[in-house]
Structures are given as structure tokens and as C-alpha cells.
Amino acid sequence: MWRQRRKWEGPSHPWQKQRLIIEKRLMKEYGLKNKRELWIAETIARKWRAYARYLNAKQAAGQDISEEKERFLTKLKKLGVLSENAELDDVLDLTVKDVLERRLQTMLVRKGLAKTMKQARQFIVHGHIMVNGEVVDAPSYLVKKEEEDKIEFVPFSPLANPEHPARKLEQKEETNEESA
């Protein structure tokens, strides 16, 4: 039987004012439910950077890492975190914001399918959003680069109708901006 582990590692010190201010700003900006969601994203970015350092150390020791390095970079490029011509050193520059930008919740707002992060979260949790033909109900789902164009409303959802009040408000705002 496998033992489940935590997906996150909390801060080393609980009451650092500067960190608390940054965390609060990020939680508001990305519409996170609690600090655990932020810590999970931080842990993901930290593990990617640690693996890049590990590969750099192996390469410096003279070991062949070309295959391992290529697999790792391909994975991050498919996730859309790195550009197509990125190198291993670019992984060291990744931050928690890079991970948070790939969340489904964030992508909905960036694509204009939801007005706010909270609304995007509600649409996802209530099962109104489909990615690549499958309903996804996890706001923390990391969207791959190839799936960006395949984010849409579920066809049988009331929100699929362009006349739905939640969608009409978006269209009204667009027409007001165009006429101004």
C-alpha cells in the first residue's frame, strides 16, 4: 500500500511580514482559496529548479545528461512554462507566478471566458468548463500549451449560451469600450 504524501512544503518561519504580504497579494491576484494552494505552486517551481541544479551538477561532473535534460525541458515546454528555445539555465529563473499562470483558473480569465478569478473558479468547480473534450473540475489543473485553444464551456451547460446573463455582461462591457 502506498502512503500519500503532502504535495507542498510550508514556509520555514510562520510570521515573516514581507512573505505574508507577498502571499496575500498573490492569493488575491490569482484567486486562490487558501495558502496551501500557493505553497503547492511554490513547491512545484522549487522542485523544477532543484532538478535543473541537479542536472547542471551532473553535467559539471562530466556525466552525459543529454537524454534526461531533453525529457525535462520537453515536459516544461509542453506545459508552456518555457519557450521553445529555452535552455536548462532558464529553468532556474522560474517563479511561483510562472506556475500560477498555467492554472486553468487563470487561463479562463486570460481568455475572457470569466470576468474575475473567483468567477472562473466557480465555473470550473460547478463543472461548466471543458478542456480538450473532457470536463475538468479542478481550478489548479495545469493547462498544457496544446490545450490552451481547447478550453471551452461544456455544450450542455447554461453558460454555453451566449445570451446567458454571466456572458452578456462581458459583451456589454466590450460594446461600451468600443463605443467610447
Curated annotation (Swiss-Prot):
Keyword terms: Ribonucleoprotein, Ribosomal protein, RNA-binding, rRNA-binding
Record-linked SMART domains: Ribosomal_S4, S4
Region (Disordered): 154-180
S-S bridge residues: none
Signal peptide (from-to): none
Pfam families reported for this sequence: S4 (PF01479)
Entry annotated with the keyword Ribosomal protein: yes
Family, per entry: Belongs to the universal ribosomal protein uS4 family.
UniProt xrefs under NCBIfam families: PRK04051.1 (NF003139), uS4_arch (TIGR01018)
Name by which UniProt lists this protein: Small ribosomal subunit protein uS4
Organism per entry: Nanoarchaeum equitans (strain Kin4-M)
